[in-house]
Amino acid sequence: MTKLTVKALSEEIGTPVDRLLQQFSDAGINKKDGDSVSEGEKQSLLVHLKKEHGSADDSASPTRLTLQRKTRSTLSVAGSGGKSKDVQVEVRKKRTYVKASALEEEKKAEQLKAEAEEQAKRDAEEAAVRELEQKAQREAEEQAKREAEAEAKAKREAEEKAKRAEADKAKKEMTKKNEQAKKEADELKARQELEATRKAEAEAAKLVEEARKLAEENEARWKEEEQKKSAAEKDADYHVTTSSHAREAEDAADRKEEQQPRRRKKKAKPAEAAAPRGGRNQRGGRNKKAQVNKPTSMQHGFDKSATVAKQDVAIGETIVVSELASKMSVKATEVIKVMMKMGAMATINQVIDQETAQLVAEEMGHKVILRKENELEEAVLSDRDNSAEAEGRAPVVTIMGHVDHGKTSTLDYIRRAHVADAEAGGITQHIGAYHVETDNGMITFLDTPGHAAFTAMRARGAQATDIVVLVVAADDGVMPQTIEAIQHAKAAGVPLIVAVNKIDKEGANPDNVKNELAQYDVIPEEWGGENIFVHISAKQGTNIDGLLEAILLQSEVLELTAVREGMASGVVVESRLDKGRGPVATVLVQSGTLNKGDIVLCGQEYGRVRAMRDENGKDIESAGPSIPVEILGLSGVPASGDEATVVRDERKAREVANYRQGKFRDVKLARQQKAKLENMFANMEAGEVAELNVVLKADVQGSVEAIADSLLKLSTDEVKVNIVGSGVGGITETDATLAAASNAIILGFNVRADATARRTVENENLDLRYYSIIYQLIDEVKAAMGGMLAPEFKQEIIGLAQVRDVFKSPKLGAIAGCMVTEGTIKRSNPIRVLRDNVVIYEGELESLRRFKDDVAEVKNGYECGIGVKNYNDVRVGDQIEVFEIVEIKRTLD
């Protein structure tokens, strides 16, 4: 038998010689590759390997060999930005080979394994039995605890039920007593009213009898006096011929009647009122005339009501005081009096807001109907037929960047590369938007130099832009206008694609651009961000197609859709006044289809589309979503960013445009409102020192210096008095002009304004005040400055409740059963939850109940249920603290 060497053994078992020698060395056998290996040495090596690979005994057992392998490869994966990424993949494999040498050993191993499994099974069963016993013990303890809680709860409910029964009984008794007292009071009142009525009727009858007796007593004397009159005076007027005694008697009767109560049950009969006193026509005529022209108080049938009839007053967003008075059928002075009582000063021609007018009208007892002035506008804009389904549309892209970073070059190259030569050759782009066709779809570009249009659209809320492409030069980096573009894009909430331009120039460093943009939260996708970076060269045309693909990929993520059929709506990109064609507006259609002849409402302008052209100057008949067009036929030049909407009726469009013009004029006038002492705080911008500009004029120089020194001493860190002009003498037009230019108030001390100055003050709506006492002037300015100070707020604890128990509610979660220990718990106030005198939660109450009834507050010494909003970790022993925020009015020290 030939001897087996180490080298031959390594070839036989497929193991490198070095590894086999190492294994021999680990087993305590020193060998070289040429040495022979005996059976004993092989057995020793096998035992060592078995120990190393987990064998438990040294006897002959299956040989176990474990192989571990590593495989590395590179996998190309497509990224979200359209670029592929290389990912390193490492595969690890582990295999174990076992060789059976003896059947007995295998059986023995199986027997040992079965015994081990049986032992493990017995141990698991014993553990399960122990766990069941522990679980049963815990359940018994919990059951006992629940029974105790249920018993305590039943006891509390019984006590509460008894208390409620007693309270209900007392309430019923009190109600019965109140009803009995009310019944007795009603009976007494009815008896008193009946007695008063009888008494009034008796007095009225007595007065009638006295008047009749007086007339009978004086009738003979009247006849004698009348016979003494001349015949020429027979036809004289009643007021001339009636004797003074008769007039005195009638006046006395009238005065006596007026002193008595006016209430009576009888009226004079019509026949008695028309019949003459005697048989003669002369005296009968006089008597009849006297009765008609001078009726007594006994003949009056009704008194004119002093109350004003209630009116339904329709009030718009603003209304003039005189118009409000006319709608309420009262004089304007009455309205001004009511406003003065309410603390508001107004003139007859002053415009007041809707809220003030509503308070005045309701104070005077009228019903108010609030009207929106833009009802017609809303009706016109809602009368549209856009019931079609939305379809995919092309993205609208705005390219921004710093000056000389290649923005215009990028636009020009895209236009030359993707527009046919017949259309693009020699034609200069003459509108601010155009669209290009690519293999994957259409893209619309907006050219907004200086970001003017983009800012205007963002300010008006018109999301005309879907994607912003930021062009940054690789050799120049981030510049101020680049930062401005980033801010515009983030404010508008649109995604940002960065085009790193000029990569073909020497000194280009795209990585530096990434690092600088990362400081402004523009992170590349390679770094785990959301912004796509594309390296391009606008001059050479390098990777321009990649930029377009990135734009289309981003638009697919946005899933842009629009209604293609129906009445169109869009936004005005730019507008101008052409010499030969009139107002021209570039409109980007956002939804629907714009057709030639449609009636368009653009902001404050309107008109019928007389002509429509694309970006190449060609006449077209219609345009769909994401298509920019030039339209002619508007009444004026609209503003950039105005919404363009197709409407049905030209007359209504004109009315809406006129309303918008008037509203814009009112807003403009309101913005020109000069600073006044009453609204100075509204004119103060947050974070800045408020300034009160003053133009001061006095009668003597000493007064000017004293007042100026006192006013300047009033200045603080938050409010500053700035005297822009001062002098001696009357207030002139120059002073009024200075105050208008500097938004100042005019203070006159013992001086007055001349006619031209008063006219300027009225035209510019300035605040002019006269004073004769210096302390009144200083006190009013000081009060105005105090109103400009920001208010302070202080928290005051108004109640404290102790948590006695916690209940679970399916609707409100954890409900804390509490006892109010201090103050009052109010539902509307904020709260804090304290545990061990440490605040663990601050919020508000969601529920406050007492005896299952929602209450507004619970006072000291009463129990209540409290549910804390958005907080369920209330425990027994916690404290719930209720506080209120009190505003402290600040004044100048």
Swiss-Prot record:
Residues 537-539 are annotated as: G5. One of its GO terms (cellular component) is cytosol. It is found in: Cytoplasm. One of its GO terms (molecular function) is GTP binding. Signal peptide: none annotated. Residues 401-408 are annotated as: G1. Residues 501-504 are annotated as: G4. Residues 392-561 form the tr-type G domain. This is Translation initiation factor IF-2. The lineage of its organism: Bacteria, Pseudomonadati, Pseudomonadota, Gammaproteobacteria, Vibrionales. The gene is infB.
